[in-house]
């Protein structure tokens, strides 16, 4: 789960500014939720 979050963060940095950003934020939030679930 942690590697998935890190890779999604790196992908967000590579995406141009014109790309849909909300979708990336939603994916990162989903990864954070998964990390919290595994940590808990």
UniProtKB/Swiss-Prot annotation:
GO terms for biological process: defense response to bacterium; defense response to fungus; killing of cells of another organism; negative regulation of cell population proliferation. Expressed in seeds (at the protein level). The keyword DNA damage does not apply. Alpha-D-mannopyranose binds at residue 11. One of its GO terms (molecular function) is D-mannose binding. Residues 3-40 form the Gnk2-homologous domain. Keywords: Antibiotic, Antimicrobial, Fungicide, Lectin, Mannose-binding, Plant defense. Possesses antifungal activity against B.cinerea, M.arachidicola, F.oxysporum, R.solani and C.comatus and moderate antibacterial activity against S.aureus, P.aeruginosa and E.coli. Inhibits HIV-1 reverse transcriptase and proliferation of murine splenocytes. Exerts antifungal activity through its carbohydrate-binding specificity. This is Antifungal protein ginkbilobin-1.
